[in-house]
Amino acid sequence: MIKKELGRSGIQVPALTFGGNVFGWTVDEATSFSLLDALVANQLNFIDTADVYSSWAAGNKGGESETVIGNWLKKSGKREQVIIATKVGKPMGAGKQGLSPRYIRQAVEDSLRRLQTDYIDLYQSHDDDRDTPLTETLAAFDELIKAGKVRAIGASNYQADRLVEALQVSEQNGLARYDTLQPEYNLYAREGYEKALEAVAQQHGLGVINFFSLASGFLTGKYRSVKDIGKSQRGDTIVTRYLNPRGLRILAALDQMADKYRTTPAQISLAWLIARPSITAPIVSATSLQQLDELVGATRLQLQAADIRALDEASRVG
């Protein structure tokens, strides 16, 4: 498995990041443990989660994903074999959100307790917090790194101008800097990242671990008509957003490439992302070992330059 560095952090990660939002939500603990064991066995040992996962599920309040991962770490004893990324900032109850130093200090202790570890490899701002000065937020993160509780920090859902400002604040004040960026990016949703964020990431040497890599499942080819709405709880939203002339054009190109490489649209979509020079490790999830095997296959797939250009053209906006 080829490894890439997360920004300038010195942390080496595989070609894909596993999205831990499924833990405590769409897979039970036993299945989660099987998936985590299989990830390590296949060298896909970079796991991304967040304190807020999976608060949206009935009966949950947040922290479920971290708890499952922590239980697995305790049972397996494989802490040194995995890279754990989590996030802070989303609402976790009354007065528990944002990026104030007080809350960051509280939230990191909660995450460490749930994960049953004494350090987090990558600690990320889940959202920008414009109510807290960047200097205060970054100073709090810097404190965590110096204390050995966090190895590196990253930003998720930041706009380009604010990301640049944060990087400047770090440099001017001698504080830890964001080494990673987590934006939405896939073969369909390209403009938001490519228009401004990509240049910032490349100029400042940031590692990019993008989410919605398969456009909520649309790029797997699962949703091709309004009749497919019932295939998942998110079917209505997916069909409404992606099922249009451009989306169908992308699916047609993926089908053509899948036939050529004797693989699946999902693997082609991920291979396209992996081939992007600015992308470090796209985030993608699985709920079964069969789906996980498909992810592993994507890391071995190398698209020809002409085919990458064909996918670029098929997904062009406008």
Predicted regions and their residues:
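Active-site beta-loop-alpha junctions enriched in small/polar residues
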Residues: 21-23, 52, 87-91, 125-128, ...
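Beta/alpha (TIM)-barrel catalytic core signal, keyed to glycine-rich beta->alpha loops juxtaposed to Asp/Glu
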Residues: 132-318
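A short acidic, helix-capping loop that chelates divalent metal ions and anchors anionic groups
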Residues: 53-58, 91-96, 294
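Active-site groove signature of glycoside hydrolases
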Residues: 112-131
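Active-site mouth loops of central-metabolism enzymes
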Residues: 20-30, 91-102, 131
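Short, acidic/polar
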Residues: 28-39, 99-114, 163-168
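N-terminal binding-site loop/beta-alpha segment at the start of enzyme catalytic domains
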Residues: 1-81, 146
